[in-house]
Amino acid sequence: GNYTERQFADALRKGIRADGQRLYPAMPYVSYAAMTDADVHALYAYFMQGVPAVEQAAPPTELPFPMNVRASMKLWNALFLDEQPLPPAPDRSPQWLRGRYLAEGAAHCGTCHTPRGFLMQEKKELNMSGAQVGPWYAPNITPHATGIGAWSETELVQYLRTGRLEGKAQAAGSM
């Protein structure tokens, strides 16, 4: 509740806390970097005016060396954080563009469904092709036959609304 809207936007899209410390990419700011100013403003307004304030100290971050060195996140961000908006795709429909924005930005689907590299960066060339997330497997959600390519629009809508699709999928883990 003590963040200004600018500080909130920087945390959300750049991974920088109000005190200037770097966030770890467990906070999916790499995906949120694609969010529009209007959506960031709407989130800020909701959190500040629509969610009751709770005094709760965050537990200390406990990571092994060298991941526990927050200053290293500056280098990680220089290598892997793209602060540019999603590239234009003038040949695509408004529905496709909105879907890309939701999947790659606000909903951050790739955060779990994209394999990670040695430095825990998303392997963009394998975007949304499925990945291990702790004890869970986030499956391939590309249009490939091994993903959701054979699903109908109705099935996809049902799954996103309910988290299950009889005979095909059941949401689990952090989904």
Question: Language-model segments: which ranges?
Answer:
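Extended, well-folded interaction surfaces typified by the phenylalanyl-tRNA synthetase beta subunit core
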Residues: 55-71
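The canonical Cys-X-X-Cys-His
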Residues: 8, 43, 102, 106-116
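Extended intrinsically disordered, low-complexity coil regions enriched in Ser, Thr, Gly, Ala
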Residues: 4-7, 17-24, 116-121, 152-155, ...
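Electrostatic cytochrome c docking/interface patches
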Residues: 75-104, 145, 150
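Hydrophobic or amphipathic alpha-helical targeting/insertion segments
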Residues: 40-47
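Detector for the c-type heme attachment site
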Residues: 13-16, 48-49, 112-118, 161, ...
